[in-house]
UniProtKB/Swiss-Prot annotation:
Keywords noted in UniProt: Cell cycle, Cell division, Septation, Sporulation
Provenance organism: Salinispora tropica (strain ATCC BAA-916 / DSM 44818 / JCM 13857 / NBRC 105044 / CNB-440)
GO cellular component: cell septum
Quaternary structure and partners: Interacts with SsgA. Interacts with FtsZ (via N-terminus).
Protein name from the UniProt record: Sporulation-specific cell division protein SsgB
Any single GO BP term: division septum assembly
Length: 143
């Protein structure tokens, strides 16, 4: 009998990078959820179109879930609801030693993405999909 592995969820979207003067630039991004890493979501910012390099961030799926309705996160990744005259968005603030970035993400995109991740791994059932040996090996390898 073969075992069917859950599939990875990937969504391509456009975000807005909000500059300190409140102007915004569009940035293509890929949202990714892999059931082999059930607690995390991965975002790849395709900054190469603006002359930079692609940048990848990973953080807790639950952080996005909470940030849809209330401020969430401390430190490097913060998420909060952001209503504008153009519609409902979610603010995604990223901080690193190299700098800070504030992105405006359409709330509807995140809701659809998260719903698709729940089909693959239900909320609260992440531990059932965690391969502890692989996770420990990744930690020891520094990945």
């Amino acid at each position: 009998m073969s075992v069917i592995r859950p599939t990875t969820v990937e969504v391509e979207t456009s975000l807005r990078l909000v500059a300190p003067d409140a102007t915004a630039l569009p940035v293509r991004a890929s949202l990714r959820y892999d059931p082999a890493d059930p607690y995390a979501v991965h975002v790849l910012f395709h900054a190469e179109s603006a002359g930079g390099e692609a940048v990848s961030w990973s953080f807790a799926r639950e952080l996005l879930v909470t940030g849809l309705d209330e401020p969430a996160g401390i430190g490097d990744v913060r998420v909060w609801p952001w209503a504008t005259p153009r519609g409902d968005f979610v603010a995604l603030a990223l901080s690193s030693p190299d700098g800070n970035a504030l992105f405006e993400v359409p709330r509807s995109v995140l809701v659809r993405f998260l719903r698709r991740t729940y089909v693959v791994v239900a909320r609260g059932r992440e531990a059932e999909h965690l391969d502890v040996d692989t996770a420990v090996n990744r930690l020891l390898a520094g990945r």
